[in-house]
Every structure is written in structure tokens, then in C-alpha cells.
Amino acid sequence: MALVIGFALVFWAIRAIGSSGGEGFYAVLSHNAMVAIFAPAFLLPLVSVAISLRRFWAEVGGKPLQLSDLMSAFKRAGKMQDLAAGHGEGCNFQDEDRFSHGRRHIHHAIMYGFLLCFASTSVATVMHYGFGLHAPYGFWSLPKLFGVSGGILLTVGCGAMVLLKQKSDRELGDPSAWGGDIGFILLLGFVGLSGLVLYALGATSVMPALLAIHLGSVLTFFLLMPYTKMAHGFYRLAALIRDAQRKRELSVGC
């Protein structure tokens, strides 16, 4: 929370310096300023994750990638197949003998919500630099459709995950990591929620303050990415790829 507030104040200070002009959000903070701040904040954490993944890959004896291994891993990840458990009844995450697919469905909402938000930014970048189509975009444009639907899934999914973790038995996991997990989920959900509020009130006088808060939360999320549970997505995908390699090797050996 301190980081979110701090970064929001930084953006507010940048806004006070002024903008070179533009429409919508760019009237508050120029496009070049956003790129200068967010490009390194996004790329440097990815470099950190890439270095650790390379070490992990060597540790587990990973082999050169094949398309079939990648397709198998992405298929399992997309379906959240392992959260259905081997018996297909879901996870027993509570202190009861009851299985549920709730955890799987909530993970689906968070993952696809995040991917839609990422797709929104990616499409907007291509439209801006590739086709000269600059923001703001209308509601029926791909950036808005991806962003709004992704923000809703992300907000609802993170809220449901917090409720689920409140009900779950903490002793089934690492109790010392529980607080960090909750903090990360709340931050990710706040990114989605603040984006939706910013879209809804983007034409009002509170837009500059909302923009500062939203961008501050996004920047915080990027910088903390290698040190939060967000990193488990990268490792999980790598583990699924290695598992696909092992299965292929066993089938060839037989």
C-alpha cells in the first residue's frame, strides 16, 4: 500500500510538471513519459525472471524445446487441468472432506482476466505504433473490449480468491507466506478495479487523481512481479513443459 501511494504521488508530481499535449489521459501524462517510466519497469523484472528461469531449467534437466511440448504445457495450463486433481473432483482446500472446483474456476478468472488486460495493452501498442491510431479509443475497439472484460474478470477473481483463502486451512500451506499471498492478490485486484473506475469516471474532474492511483498500482505490480506469487506462473509453465518432455521421452523409450 505504501508503494501504491508513493508511486501515485510520483505520478501526481509528474502531472504537475505538465504534458506536451494530447487527448484523454495524455492530457495529464504524455505518452512519451508513460513509455519512459513503464518500459524499464516492465522489462527489467522480466529479465530477472528470465535469469531465474534459466537456472531452474538447468536444475530440472530441461531439454531443447519442441512445439509438441509447448502445446501440451499450454493446454494443461489453459484448462487448469491439475487443479481438477487426478480424480477430477477438484481440490480439497478446506478443513473438511469436501472437494470443489471453486479454486480452479477462480484461477481461471484471474489468469484470463490478466491475459485480457495484457492483450488490451499489446493491441493498443500495435495500433499506436503500427497503424498510427492513437488513444483514446472507443468502447467497441479491441483495447477497450479486452481491457474492460479483463478488468472485470480480474477484480471478481481476486475478490473471490481472498474469500476462498479466508476459508481455507492455512496449515495446508506455508503459514508464513499467507500474508504475502493476500497482499499480492489484493494488489492485483486493485489494479483491475482502479482501471475500471478510471474508465467509468475518465471524463470527470477526478480523472487525474484516478489516473495517478491506477498507474501507481500498475507500476508497483510490475516492480514486485519477480518477488510475489506472480512468479509462480512462469515456473509452473516451465515445469509443465519439462513434464511434457519427460512423458515424451518415456513414450519413445517404451
Listing of model-derived features with the role each one plays in the protein:
Residues M1-C254:
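Membrane-embedded alpha-helical bundles of multi-pass integral membrane proteins
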